[in-house]
UniProtKB/Swiss-Prot annotation:
Residues 657-704 have a biased composition (Low complexity). Residues 639-656 have a biased composition (Pro residues). It comes from Drosophila melanogaster (Fruit fly). The gene is Pep. This is Zinc finger protein on ecdysone puffs. A motif (Nuclear localization signal) lies at residues 379-383, 544-548. Disulfide bonds: none annotated.
Length: 716
């Protein structure tokens, strides 16, 4: 036990001062339970009844090894103690009694900070009951150790609690230890024996090492790779796997679309069958089911498996690798195979590649390969001689079915296939009589007379070809005009090439070529239908445009006809009066004539006589011309007398009577002349209108003076 005594006499005085100032422990002594002067909260000293720290004992002579951390100096009051000496002694004791290890952040309790929660604040506690000097000393002595308030001075220092408050849930020191131990164990596991090191030292060679670099192309991601390692990493990578999942989903959607198209076609066929059944022209058809197509169809399963939709779906769902001669259950397995090292090696050896190389390759088929595709008719077994009559009946039925095939098509063929299967079943039952059984050749199918057997450039295919399609016959060639020679023989329908003419001839009799030929004819027929529809639509459009033009021209023609009829009835419109200037000129002339015609006015009699004489001369000329025109019109008539009598007498008064009214009105204001002229035109009697055809006949010979004079009658 090491004790240091510094200036004992002042210490005693401090104790006495602490007795006096004991009641000032906690700012007004409002909370006596937290009195730092003594009692149960006697920090740094033994538990005793002297609550004011009356024991004459050095503050550093404590049983607590860490007594220097807080000590009894928390009970010290007043400013007589030398602050520097206390700080020096406090730091000295801390360095002596603390752990000998260098300070580390891992030793901090819980939160690891200098100011934790309220119960974890370290350093010398500030005694609020003491004087100002003690508080100053405690503030300057913050470098002391950290201790929990709950620890008693007599007992040993408790270890810091683990898992306390704050952000850290585990002690950082323990966590670091566990991590180091874990890494050490892993390193021990990875370290093999020296003998094993020599075996595993060489790295594994990539399975794509023997594949040429130009073959490293991923057709799913459409990416080119530069070497074997990069290609292998791409195949195992996340991007490639995600792309593969998306393409697999697209394959599923496309397969469903093909199935839906087949279902729609079958529904249309069933509707047609129902219609024929209602009309009494067809009997009930039996439905069958295809698992791959997920389809209920009319006919036999063997006929359905040869149909275009079934073969298309089968080729899509179960592709075949030509280079490796392998078939796959799903298309995604086929894609995986195309990226395998085995396939790429064979593709490089055969100088073929998926994509560009495969398109550039020209495979030429031989006679042996094409002979494999010939489909010979299956022979049926015939029962013994005892049942010759039944066999003859069966042949008759079969011939009848063959005759009906031209009309009913694939359905009759399906029935024939069913009959063939029934006959085969009957023969199986009599296998014991093999000696008496004989084989009978199947009769070749009968084609319609006008069936299509060939197509040349320029030939027209009709829109309806269902009744003109030939049946398959392995002894007859179809479409030989579609096979041309190009240093070899090419079939444009099947896109295949052959080495000799014999091979081409055999190919024209194969089932694949026959199926492609029927597909080609149907496509041409649909093209013809489309062309006909387009031509009909063009004709209809032209007719519609013509009708629209005629409808637009009809009102104009009607208006012109009405104008001509009005001109024939009477010349009520003068072209010279179309503008306002002509009307003004005529109005001035009317005023002048009205002034000349006025009688009984206040003007001089000499002027009236002159004007009257001029007017009379003009009227005489007009009457003479009207009489000539009327005579010209009346010459073809048999009775000219009744028409001549009213003509010379009546036109003169209407010209004079309305002319008197505007003369009186023209004297005060010349503006009233148009109204007067209008009244004169309206007041003209009907005989003047009857004389208008004569004026129309003589209109070409009329003088300008006469035109102005006539303006009063036909102005409006």
């Amino acid at each position: 036990m090491v004790s240091v005594k510094v200036n004992g006499n002042p210490q005693n005085r401090l104790v006495n001062n602490a007795k006096v100032n004991g009641n000032m422990a906690f700012r007004g002594n409002q909370n006596r339970n937290r009195n730092f002067g003594g009692g149960n909260n006697n920090y740094g000293g033994p538990m005793g009844a002297n609550r004011m720290g009356g024991m004459n004992m050095s503050p550093w002579e404590s049983q607590n090894p860490g007594g220097g951390q807080f000590g009894n100096n928390m009970r010290q009051g007043g400013g007589q103690m030398n602050a520097q000496a206390i700080n020096l002694a406090n730091n000295l004791l801390n360095n002596l009694f603390r752990n000998q290890n260098p300070p580390s952040l891992l030793d901090l309790p819980r939160g690891g900070g200098g100011m934790g929660n309220r119960n974890q604040r370290g350093g010398p506690m500030v005694s609020r009951g003491g004087g100002a000097g003690n508080r100053l000393n405690n503030r300057r002595g913050q470098g002391g150790g950290f201790q929990n308030r709950g620890a008693t001075g007599s007992g040993p220092k408790p270890p810091p609690k683990q898992g306390g408050g704050g952000i850290r849930k585990q002690n950082a020191f323990d966590r670091a230890k566990k991590l180091l131990a874990k890494n050490a164990n892993q390193n021990k596991k990875k370290e093999p024996t020296p003998g094993e090191k020599k075996i595993e030292s060489p790295t594994k060679e990539s399975p794509y090492a023997s594949v040429p670099n130009d073959m490293f192309y991923c057709h799913l991601c459409k990416k080119h790779m530069w070497d074997a390692n990069s290609f292998e990493n791409h195949i195992k990578g996340r991007t490639h796997l995600m792309m593969r999942e998306g393409i697999e989903e697209s394959y599923r959607l496309k397969a469903n679309m093909i199935r839906q198209e087949a279902k729609i076609a079958e529904q249309l066929k069933s509707i047609e069958f129902d219609r024929l059944k209602r009309m009494g022209k067809s009997k009930q058809r039996q439905l069958d089911y295809c698992t791959m197509c997920d389809l209920n169809f009319h006919g036999h399963i063997s006929t359905h498996r040869k149909s275009e939709g079934h073969l298309q779906l089968k080729k899509f769902l179960h592709p075949k690798c030509i280079e490796c001669n392998k078939e796959f259950a799903t298309r995604i397995d086929y894609d995986t195979h195309l990226l395998s090292a085995e396939h790429l090696k064979k593709a490089a050896e055969n100088n073929t590649k998926v994509g560009e190389r495969k398109r550039q390759t020209l495979p030429i088929s031989t006679e042996e390969e094409e002979t494999r595709d010939l489909r010979l008719p299956q022979k049926r077994k015939k029962k013994p001689v005892k049942k010759e009559g039944e066999a003859a009946d069966g042949e008759a039925k079969k011939e009848g079915a063959g005759d009906g095939e031209g009309a009913e098509g694939d359905e009759a063929e399906g029935e024939e296939a069913k009959e063939g299967e029934e006959a085969a079943d009957e023969t199986k039952e009599g296998d014991e009589l093999n000696e008496s059984q004989e084989e009978e050749e199947v009769a070749l199918p009968v084609d319609p007379e006008d069936c299509i057997l060939d197509f040349n450039d320029g030939d027209e295919i009709p829109s309806e070809v269902d009744t003109r399609l030939p049946k398959y016959n392995w002894q007859r060639a179809v479409g030989p005009g579609l096979i041309s020679k190009l240093e070899c023989y090419e079939c444009s329908v099947c896109s295949k090439f052959f080495d000799t003419e014999v091979t081409a001839e055999i190919h024209s009799r194969t089932a694949t070529h026959h199926r492609n030929f029927l597909k080609f004819i149907n496509e041409k027929s649909s093209d013809t239908k489309i062309a006909q529809k387009r031509a009909a639509a063009a004709l209809e459009e032209n007719e519609r445009k013509k009708r629209k033009v005629e409808e637009a021209e009809a009102p104009a023609a009607e208006g012109a006809a009405e104008e001509t009829t009005e001109g024939a009835e009477g010349e009520l419109y003068d072209p010279s009066e179309a503008t306002g200037d002509d009307e003004d000129v005529e109005m001035v002339d009317d005023n002048a004539e009205g002034e000349g015609e006025g009688e009984g006015d206040e003007e001089a009699e000499a002027e009236v006589e002159e004007d009257g004489a001029g007017q009379d001369n003009g009227e005489e000329e007009m009457e003479a011309q009207e009489e000539e025109g009327q005579e010209g019109e009346q010459e073809p008539e048999p009775e000219p007398a009744p028409v001549q009598t009213p003509a010379p007498a009546e036109p003169a008064p209407p010209a004079k009577t309305p002319a008197k009214t505007p003369t009186k009105a023209a004297a005060p204001a010349a503006v009233a002349s148009p109204a007067a002229a209008a009244t004169s035109a309206d007041a003209s009697p009907s005989p003047a209108k009857k004389a208008t055809p004569a004026r129309a006949a003589a209109g070409a010979k009329a003088t300008p003076q006469r035109q102005r004079a006539r303006g009063r009658y036909n102005r409006y």
